[in-house]
């Protein structure tokens, strides 16, 4: 519907599982994310949003399990904090070189985090208007899905 690539992931232990994807013609050949694929939570927008909106206890345990430098862990913590404050995460070249994505949390009727939704396309840092379009379209999709799931998450936050 958005004519951009869309991915849906769910938490799967300390990783995420891609359960659905719709890829556009311009990103399909580049995408390294496939239905049934398992991915690290700290790479890719639909994965990182699962980590950003997870409980502080889970985040801490997960971050401590990563084999990253302290500097990388500190940067990741700041990125996750920013994503949570914005209500979405944005990544450039994190999971697939040449692509960017914007990830949004999906909640169920009990307002429990159940999935991550990302929309993305070819990375063009010279066109911030394109990124903003993806943010708006992704947010609209996330709101619709959350509403259909019975969640009031997006009615509780401001744009």
Give, region by region, the residue ranges found by the protein language model:
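Intrinsically disordered, low-complexity terminal regulatory regions
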Residues: 1-23, 133, 137-159
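Amphipathic alpha-helical effector-binding/dimerization core
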Residues: 1-62
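Sparse recognition of residues in long alpha-helices and their boundaries
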Residues: 24, 35, 126-127, 153-154
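Alpha-helix boundary recognition
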Residues: 51, 64, 81-84
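A general structural signal marking secondary-structure boundaries and capping sites
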Residues: 54-57, 87, 149
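Short, hydrophobic secondary-structure boundary micro-motifs
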Residues: 61-63, 92, 154-155
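Short histidine-centered catalytic/ligand-binding loop motif
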Residues: 63-69
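Extended hydrophobic
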Residues: 69-144
């Amino acid at each position: 519907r958005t004519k951009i690539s869309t991915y849906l992931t769910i938490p799967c232990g300390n990783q995420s599982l891609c359960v659905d994807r719709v890829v556009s013609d311009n990103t399909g050949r580049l995408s390294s994310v496939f239905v049934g694929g398992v991915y690290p939570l700290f790479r890719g927008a639909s994965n990182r949003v699962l980590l950003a909106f997870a409980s502080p206890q889970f985040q801490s345990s997960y971050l401590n399990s990563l084999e990253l430098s302290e500097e990388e862990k500190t940067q990741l913590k700041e990125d996750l904090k920013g994503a949570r404050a914005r209500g979405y995460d944005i990544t450039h070249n994190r999971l697939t070189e040449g692509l960017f994505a914007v990830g949004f949390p999906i909640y169920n009727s009990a307002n429990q985090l159940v999935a991550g939704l990302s929309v993305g396309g070819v990375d063009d840092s010279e066109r911030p208007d394109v990124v903003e379009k993806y943010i708006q379209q992704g947010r609209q999709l996330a709101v619709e899905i959350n509403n259909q799931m019975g969640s009031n998450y997006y009615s509780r936050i401001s744009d």
